[in-house]
From Swiss-Prot:
The gene is mt. InterPro entries: Metalthion_dom_sf, Metalthion_dom_sf_vert, Metalthion_vert, Metalthion_vert_metal_BS. This is Metallothionein. It comes from Pagrus major. Coiled coil: none annotated. A divalent metal cation 6 binds at C36, C40, C43, C59. Class I metallothioneins contain 2 metal-binding domains: four divalent ions are chelated within cluster A of the alpha domain and are coordinated via cysteinyl thiolate bridges to 11 cysteine ligands. Cluster B, the corresponding region within the beta domain, can ligate three divalent ions to 9 cysteines. Belongs to the metallothionein superfamily. Type 1 family. Residues 1-28 are annotated as: Beta. A divalent metal cation 3 binds at C14, C18, C23, C28.
Amino acid sequence: MDPCECSKTGTCNCGGSCTCTNCSCTTCKKSCCSCCPSGCTKCASGCVCKGKTCDTSCCQ
């Protein structure tokens, strides 16, 4: 069971211990959710994701 309600609320502000596996949120901590593609250097830990593509608009 996903400990976070990312897919329900659209937001995820989890701590480092969170293990979201089905996150479809638009604003979340990269350290918790996989909003951005794995290996995306522009989405550093703690960054707030804005999309699912690895580009300049990926995070804010």
